[in-house]
Amino acid sequence: MQRAHPASTQRRAFLAGLALLAPHSSWAQAGTPASTVTTKPIPSTGEQIPLIGLGSWITFNVGNDRVAQDACADVMRAFFDAGGRMIDSSPMYGSSQATIGHGLARIGIGKGLPFAADKVWISSGARGPAQIEASRRLWGLPRFDLLQVHNLLDWEEHLPALLAMKAAGRLRYVGITTSEGRRHREVEALLRSQPLDFVQLSYNLLDREAEERLLPLARERGVAVIANRPFREGALLRELARHKLPPWAAEIGCDGWAQFALKFIVSHPAVTCAIPATSSVAHVRQNLGAALGAMPDAALRRRMAAHVASL
């Protein structure tokens, strides 16, 4: 199997502190049974979030099908019960935002859940605020935790607006997104020039271009990284399912290829969390299992990547 490519003062103080710690000593385990998943800090604030989030691309785009909406709500309930927090969506994702709102209303989630991440995706800066408000109403939340400029669309207008929302206390974090290896040079320039809290990009066992420049730069700049497309929309797992999981995967508690793939991603020092999407309760529980137990060190990560490349 071939990989796609070979290869403010508060923030500075926080990063300096991290530099004094062992590579993974900033990872935390929450103390209650429902939240024993491993977490990592958001560099700009130190707030801890679980290593595994929940994406909604395709899987939550179920229209007005109430049975499917309820099934997605069950996935969300299982996600929260297993210690998950971040749910990510976008106006681009069809009815996914409304599905999330239905699920949150049905479950009756309390304060602090979810960590709501959405995006602005419209080719007009003037229309951005209206789109954001429409998205907020679909979720049924008082505000978002994180808003991202989706695929850098009209970022020159949207990014200043999001930063103004944050300064006014109407938003906690600001980010940008890209996917499938596109526009990495532009993302790099924005990481260097803009006060970003998050960057979202594609990173998985095969798509590893971000390792070369973006992941090291995000770590240097104190920007949290969300990894999207961890399974290549399922194609990676379908291919891996043709092969047996190597016995040494048990060293880090993997009980399947999904956990193998996710542990590889979130064990990268620069990656804050991954956001696999699923419409299966069993799968969301398996995915959250990747945030439990031991994580691969650098040597084991190399072994994991080499093994998959050899298949």
Predicted regions and their residues:
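N-terminal binding-site loop/beta-alpha segment at the start of enzyme catalytic domains
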Residues: 2-113
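Structured C-terminal cap/extension of enzyme domains
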Residues: 42, 198, 213-311
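Active-site-proximal loop/turn and secondary-structure-junction residues that shape catalytic pockets
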Residues: 58, 91-93, 120-122, 153, ...
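A structural motif corresponding to the C-terminal end of an alpha-helix
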Residues: 82, 165, 267-271
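Glycine/proline-rich, positively charged
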Residues: 122-209, 213, 220-226
